[in-house]
Amino acid sequence: MADVYLDNNATTRVDDEIVQAMLPFFTEQFGNPSSLHSFGNQVGMALKKARQSVQKLLGAEHDSEILFTSCGTESDSTAILSALKAQPERKTVITTVVEHPAVLSLCDYLASEGYTVHKLPVDKKGRLDLEHYASLLTDDVAVVSVMWANNETGTLFPIEEMARLADDAGIMFHTDAVQAVGKVPIDLKNSSIHMLSLCGHKLHAPKGVGVLYLRRGTRFRPLLRGGHQERGRRAGTENAASIIGLGVAAERALQFMEHENTEVNALRDKLEAGILAVVPHAFVTGDPDNRLPNTANIAFEYIEGEAILLLLNKVGIAASSGSACTSGSLEPSHVMRAMDIPYTAAHGTVRFSLSRYTTEEEIDRVIREVPPIVAQLRNVSPYWSGNGPVEDPGKAFAPVYG
């Protein structure tokens, strides 16, 4: 029986069509695009086509607004650090408490260097308070960096409105759209977004390639200096094969956009309904009415998410957990804590993230496998007694966060 992969928010498999498009650029069209000979010209033309494909996916006005990078993290760092370098008189950054570590870790570093960092809180559904956000848009803010969609819950933020408010206040706005691109329509030419990050491996393209969208006229300072590549904005010989793959991925993302929002969405809903109909004391986290079509984050109370994942893996199902113990801490993820999910549930969150390759048969299999795994783990849980939770879970195991 084939394995079931439901961890597509972590990475996606590369489309066969994309692999085939990339192969010639390893062994046949291998020239440096900066070279004047035909080998270089062939690659240069292919890069231009890929740039235009990404431009179309993002709805950007100019293909020159597309800068190829190595990954989403590089794009995020470039955007934020550029905004600060271009405006040395401004010392404040606005972000959220639920950002990806690519942004949060950088903001923590900036805070240690003397910058003021405002981290916007979220409510129990992972939503932002726009009035609070607007009150922070002062003359000292250099950049706002807010993710378009949360990688754990799939909750979508009102990015267009937030960008407009920032732009009206004369503040640069950046969004990490790594999870959103290809799943929700984006029309940058009619938005107030100044900078946007994406990465290839969330789009069925290879790892090691990303994009920073930079609106024409936005003040910019390069992170990498050296050659003239990317119009002098990102030095280094282009990763041609991967960029070509990303271009094809952008074309296919447009082709499958409706599929993502209909068929994939329906499978995600079926997965949630099937599990919740059988498993008591479980619920979906995030905003069920405003989220990515492929993401289901389910909290299974009174058990550990990692234990669920290990048992799912034994039966050939790959998912991920929101409760990270990689640092030796028993705390759940920063996203669950920010949403004030009860500790008895936050420790048991599992994220199922689908793709256009996910089948109904695979979803049916997951629906069959999850309930007995949850029951098995609850039978040995200190929080569980018989057919329900103990009277006072806090006495069974003290929470490790307040």
Swiss-Prot record:
GO MF: cysteine desulfurase activity; iron-sulfur cluster binding; metal ion binding; pyridoxal phosphate binding
Residues noted as binding [2Fe-2S] cluster in the record, renumbered to the chain: 325
EC number(s) stated in the UniProt entry for this protein: 2.8.1.7
Catalytic residues (positions): 325
Reaction catalyzed: (sulfur carrier)-H + L-cysteine = (sulfur carrier)-SH + L-alanine
Residues that hold pyridoxal 5'-phosphate according to the record: 72-73, 151, 179, 199-201, 237
Domain of life: Bacteria
Keyword Iron-sulfur appears in the UniProt entry: yes
Sorted UniProt keywords: Iron, Iron-sulfur, Metal-binding, Nitrogen fixation, Pyridoxal phosphate, Transferase
Observed effect of gene inactivation: Fixes nitrogen very poorly; has very slow diazotrophic growth on nitrogen-free agar plates. A double nifS-nifV deletion no longer fixes nitrogen.
Enzyme class, UniProt record, top EC level: transferase
Cofactor(s) it depends on: pyridoxal 5'-phosphate
GO BP annotations listed: amino acid metabolic process; nitrogen fixation
N6-(pyridoxal phosphate)lysine: residues bearing it: 202
InterPro entries reported for this sequence: Aminotrans_V_dom (IPR000192), Aminotrans_V_PyrdxlP_BS (IPR020578), Cys_deSase_NifS_bac/arc (IPR017772), Cysteine_dSase (IPR016454), PyrdxlP-dep_Trfase (IPR015424), PyrdxlP-dep_Trfase_major (IPR015421), PyrdxlP-dep_Trfase_small (IPR015422)
Disulfide bond annotation, renumbered to this chain: none
Function of the protein: Catalyzes the removal of elemental sulfur atoms from cysteine to produce alanine. Seems to participate in the biosynthesis of the nitrogenase metalloclusters by providing the inorganic sulfur required for the Fe-S core formation.
Family to which this protein belongs: Belongs to the class-V pyridoxal-phosphate-dependent aminotransferase family. NifS/IscS subfamily.
Protein name listed in UniProt: Cysteine desulfurase NifS
Natural source organism: Azotobacter vinelandii
